A protein has these predicted regions:
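C-terminal effector modules of nucleic-acid-centric enzymes and ribosome-associated factors
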Residues: 14-17, 155-158, 162, 172, ...
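Residue-level signature of catalytic and energy-coupling elements of molecular machines
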Residues: 22, 28, 47, 75, ...
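P-loop NTPase switch module centered on the Walker A-proximal segment
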Residues: 4-102, 114
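Conserved catalytic-core segments of large NTP-driven translation/proteostasis enzymes
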Residues: 164, 171-334
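Helix-rich terminal scaffold detector
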Residues: 1-3, 9-34, 38, 50-53, ...
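Conserved Switch II/interswitch segment of TRAFAC-class P-loop GTPases
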Residues: 90-92, 97-103, 111-135, 141-164
């Protein structure tokens, strides 16, 4: 019981891995799991058997990350593969995201909740287009820490000159994109150099190993706003003799804290009331905070529907607009163009909307802002302005990731075609 409680109380670090194809993301995760003794004997036996069936003389640690069978047989990661492990100092959730350019949308999904992003670079190839793309997306998503793991150092004889050039190239790129808090570590995921254990092949490197850095990097606990935000997911009105007059509003707290007696405002209508109770299963809570899912009851019977947002009346209010400027990452093969119409979904709110203007597109190769663009193609990153049929209640993404983000849905196919971060 004590060991279980200790595990639950341990600090959690969520991190994602990203890089170009074959940079060694899955091998790195496999090495972390293997060297930190976070795999079971039967898992290792299965990987050894799979490695032999492929004709590999050594154990292919990339197979430890699992994923779909078809993807493993191709030797690539397509979907986002999540892994969990712990050391005596911290517990971790890893999102292994795809390297192929056509799967950038999966990388956005995997990195959206991360505290840290590991960007892998093949020491033989240096900074590539996908390196820039993944770094820029990590920056847009507000990930507070970026760890650049320069992998396959064994294939360049652990050359300090090669390492220094890649560091210089990355710093030049990161400064142009205003990316901060970057740490560089030379590694060989295949052989384990500087992953968990310090390597004697890089005497010129005096920094931490990759795992040591993951165990000690500050975890940003402030991932949501200090101001109360409660997107209403469902209105509960049970018709029963036990609860004849019950009317509750279910949802997840996406910012701040709420207590019975607090004065709230319903947006976008502006109607006000006070909190009567905070219900969770069959309990009445004294308070609720992010990211708790609860049901609120109010002292007044007012009109509230799914998609409305409850806020505290005496706190900073979110914006309520129909014209919104945001950064967008386009996911779909069908281009986005001015006047194109989409379903806009933000938290529990859904409305029709259209692209009013494409303000600029970021050129990933030159890092310049390209103006006068008529459409966005798959994997383009741009700043656009949209117009919604109904007012949107929102915060900036940097202030609240839930109320500051939205997705674009194709009304014909119901596919998610883009993700937006409100500026």
């Amino acid at each position: 019981m004590e060991s279980t409680r200790g595990y639950l109380d341990m600090e959690l670090l969520r991190f994602s891995t990203a890089g170009s194809v074959d940079d060694g993301k899955s091998t790195l995760i496999g090495r972390l799991l293997y060297d930190s003794k976070s795999i079971f004997e039967d898992q290792l036996e299965a990987v050894e058997a799979a490695s032999k069936s492929r004709g590999n003389e050594e154990v292919n640690l990339a197979l430890l990350t699992g994923g779909l069978r078809a993807e493993r047989e191709q030797g690539i990661t397509i979907d986002v593969a999540y892994r969990y492990f712990a050391t005596p100092k911290r517990k971790f959730i890893i999102a292994d995201t795809p390297g192929h350019i056509q799967y950038t949308r999966n990388m956005v999904t995997g990195a959206s909740t991360a505290d840290l992003s590991i960007i892998l670079i093949d020491a033989r190839h240096g900074v590539l287009e996908q390196t820039v793309r993944h770094s820029y997306i990590s920056s847009l998503l507000g990930i507070p820490h970026i760890l650049v793991a320069i992998n396959k150092m064994d294939l360049v004889d652990f050359s300090k000159d090669v390492y220094d050039k890649i560091v210089a190239d990355y710093k030049k790129m990161s400064e142009a994109l205003d990316i901060k808090n970057v740490v560089f570590i030379p590694i060989s995921a295949k052989d384990g150099d500087n992953v968990v254990n310090k390597s004697d092949k890089t005497p010129w490197y005096e920094g931490p190993t990759l795992l040591n850095y993951l165990e000690t990097v500050p975890v940003g606990h402030k991932t949501v706003s200090d101001f109360f935000r409660f997107p209403v997911q469902y209105v509960i009105r049970p018709i029963s003799s036990q609860f004849p007059d019950y009317r509750g509003y279910a949802g997840r707290v996406s910012g701040g804290i709420i207590r019975p007696g607090d004065k709230i405002r319903v947006l976008p209508s502006g109607t006000e009331s006070t909190v009567k109770s905070i219900d969770f299963v069959e309990e009445h809570l004294e308070e609720a905070y992010a990211p708790m899912s609860v049901t609120l009851t109010l002292n007044d019977d007012i009109d509230i529907s799914r998609g409305d947002t409850l806020v505290k009346a005496d706190e900073k209010q979110p914006s309520i607009e129909q014209d919104i400027t945001l950064d967008v990452c386009w996911f779909n093969e069908r281009p986005a163009a001015v006047r194109n119409k989409y379903v806009i979904r933000q938290a529990t709110f859904e409305t029709q909307g259209l692209i009013r203007s494409i303000n600029y597109r970021r050129n990933i190769n030159t890092l310049e802002k390209e103006e006068g663009v008529s459409e966005l193609k798959m994997n383009d990153i741009a700043e656009i302005t949209i117009h919604t049929a109904n007012p949107l209640v929102f915060d900036k993404y940097t202030e609240n990731k839930v109320t500051g983000s939205l997705i674009f849905i194709d009304p014909d196919t119901n596919e998610t075609v883009g993700a937006g971060l409100i500026k």
